[in-house]
Amino acid sequence: MTMLIKFIVCFIAGIGAGLGTGFAGMSAAAVISPMLITFLDMPAYEAVGIALASDVLASAVSAYTYGKNKNLDIRNGVVMMVSVLSFTMVGSWIASQVPNSTMGSFSVFMTFLLGVKFIVKPVMTTKNAMEAVDPKKRFVQSVICGVMIGFICGFIGAGGGMMMLLILTSVLGYELKTAVGTSVFIMTFTAFTGAVSHFAIGGMPNLWCLVFCVGSTLLWARIAARFANKASPATLNRATGVVLVVLGVGVMGGN
């Protein structure tokens, strides 16, 4: 496999993953894993490890951008993160026992459906409505939801981004920017844990693919997060929906 082909595949995967992360708090695994598996014939477990590693910096720089614009709920984010992390390791170990084809397809389909939801039924919750929810109720919900997300995160190799965005907007009643900001904040840590456990169980991945994917995802996540924080809620819902639908269709088509 020539270095140029590796670079092109990883760069294009990084564009999709970065835009998905910066706009929607989507895990890079939903895009990077299927592309590496399909076009570079990479084993699924190795591809997921690279995708999670790409997630770490992309999510961190996105979380910083959202936090700087006061679109981040750190208190509940930490609560959810602890329960997510506890179950990421469990999911990752079980994933190592599962055949290649089972992994990835679930997250791709979910990406597409969530994109359609944002276009058809946008999240227009305001920060005032969001802050009116009882803190104790939100705490309990955050713990329960975190356990579910953590297991799925480790199992399908997603930083749980789509699950978190869906739960933060639909179950916990967050407005979209705060939901994405909180999602990428949590994902920074879940993806790091997932990547470390993947590399510990499966060994180090292809170094060049890792470097290319991390660099491209980081660049495009930064661009998307800066745009998202300046956009109006209606524009952001539409942009998020379109990005998710295009990525979902593109990856399903590639498979």
Enumerate the predicted regions with their spans:
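Small-residue hotspots at the loop-to-helix junctions and early N-terminal turns
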Residues: A44-V48, V180, V184
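ABC-type ATPase nucleotide-binding domains, specifically the catalytic core motifs of the NBD
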Residues: G173
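Hydrophobic/aromatic end-of-helix segments at the C-terminal termini of transmembrane alpha-helices
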Residues: V31-I32, G160-M164
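Juxtamembrane transmembrane-helix boundary motif
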Residues: M1-A17, S27, V31-S33, I37-F39, ...
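Membrane-embedded alpha-helical segments of transport systems
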Residues: A53-V61, S86-F87, I94, F185-T193
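A small-residue-rich subset of transmembrane alpha-helices
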Residues: S54, T182-H198, W208-W220
